[in-house]
From Swiss-Prot:
Belongs to the IlvD/Edd family. GO terms for biological process: isoleucine biosynthetic process; L-valine biosynthetic process. This is Dihydroxy-acid dehydratase. Coiled coil: none annotated. It comes from Neisseria gonorrhoeae (strain ATCC 700825 / FA 1090).
Amino acid sequence: MPEYRSKTSTHGRNMAGARALWRATGVMETDFGKPIIAVANSFTQFVPGHVHLHNMGQLVAREIEKAGAIAKEFNTIAIDDGIAMGHSGMLYSLPSRDLIADSIEYMVNAHCADALVCISNCDKITPGMLIAAMRLNIPTIFVSGGPMEAGKVIGVANIQPERRLDLIDAMIESADDNVSNRQVEEVEQNACPTCGSCSGMFTANSMNCLTEALGLSLPGNGSYLATHAGRKELFLEAGRMIVEITKRYYEQDDETVLPRSIATKKAFENAMTMDIAMGGSTNTILHLLAVANEAGVDFKMADIDRLSRVVPCICKTAPNNHDYYMEDVHRAGGIFAILKELDKAGKLHTDVYTIHAPTLKDAIEKWDVTNPENTRAIERFKAAPGGVRTTQAFSQNRIWKTLDLDREKGCIRDVAHAYSQDGGLAVLFGNIAERGCVVKTAGVDESILKFTGRARVFESQEAAVEGILGNQIVAGNIVIIRYEGPKGGPGMQEMLYPTSYLKSKGLGKACALLTDGRFSGGTSGLSIGHASPEAAEGGAIGLVHEGDTIEIDIPKRSIRLVISDEELAARRAEMEARGSKAWKPENRDRYVSAALRAYGAMATSADKGAVRDVSQIER
């Protein structure tokens, strides 16, 4: 029987000083001996996905205390990728994932907490907390802030029909010379109407959905709107459940509630299967690889490639399809509706554990909104957007009269009526990316699934943006942005502005983009990222010359620099001959802080999840 970790600092004569300090935090004499639950919040006023989390930690804490445990809240950092986008701030986004994981490890281990509640929401916060959960392997539950409502705009002087929109529309239209200043202003004012993570299937929402598929959060966690009053119950239930599973582990020796018992190889395959089926962000691949690495699970790019070939796309939302947003996914039954359709097609391992049901199979049955007997599930997934601008959580209680149960033409479809039999994400291999690169196929037009073009080479995102806005890119070009990987950036910037500007210039279906950097979950089009190994690690993307021909064949999962092996070897030898200047960008003027240099010194390429490898600096 495992012993409560907290006894280290709460029991024994020699811990009198520690107990004195615990008392100063509000712990009473009768509390000693109760489990101590750490509540890792990520509230910040910088990020709309986190601005409403101010009181969430205490909401969970009070429920924990009612259930018979001690709750202690602390905070982590949270970076808004959208605000950090397009300037040097984006260098800090991915490295913050590791800082978040480290900070949680430090706080939980320093204070000997017995269990953990992770209150996350946006892009790097959820994966950072997942990494911490795997590292600590104590009872853990995730509850996120929820997605924002989709924006709406009527159009200038009510001439245009009403349309829904999001952050990406503001970025694209701001660079489109055919869109007036007034139209841009209207889009800007309406794109992000409420608190919550951005309204499409971008990175934040993708990751929060994946915590459901992994079995570490409650049903609805990824799709229940931040503004809806019903979401409050997720936080309250998380507070009660963490105490329950904590006692099951420490008092009943039930290891099935531990993160590493839940997030097994089968669970990672389930999560990736669901991700492919819903056309999630390519960043999810990066993060799942990193989380699996921390969990000690042998889950690699080859596994993702294998799954991508057999899983169809059965849910297609913004940015890949502007008919549907997260609020529509929720109305259709949420993530468990997607999981049900995948299970019917034999695509899942349903014998895995979850924190809220004995097995995934049990959970799918319990949360099936097509079963009229599941009244709790039906009530939860009728939650609708309020349509009122607000930064307040739980501020409206509007409900849909009916659910979207149309599995032929609705938001979530059965496998027979899939949006495409090819999944929403794919891994490509070839001489330019020997360890793979990633594309969100759900966002690629069918006309360019096979594409051959001439390389336009840029040594930084800034140079590429300047080239695109300066009309240097024409139809048939493949924009190469290199030395933007985890090590080369350092920090692996998102390339949302280059892809958005290509659309602004009318080149969204006429060009491709290849980078060793990554993309926002809001990216669509023939945008291929995570080229591994990256240029700074000796990857062949660093050997591409201006005007080279590159062939892309998504159905065959291939990408090829059209030169001979001998020519490629000669270019590599020429690069190596540059000595200390080899595998470094030319003429790039970029300030890199000591913190970023430290990250870059340990960072691995994207095919390994961009995790830190301390052995690279050990002597």
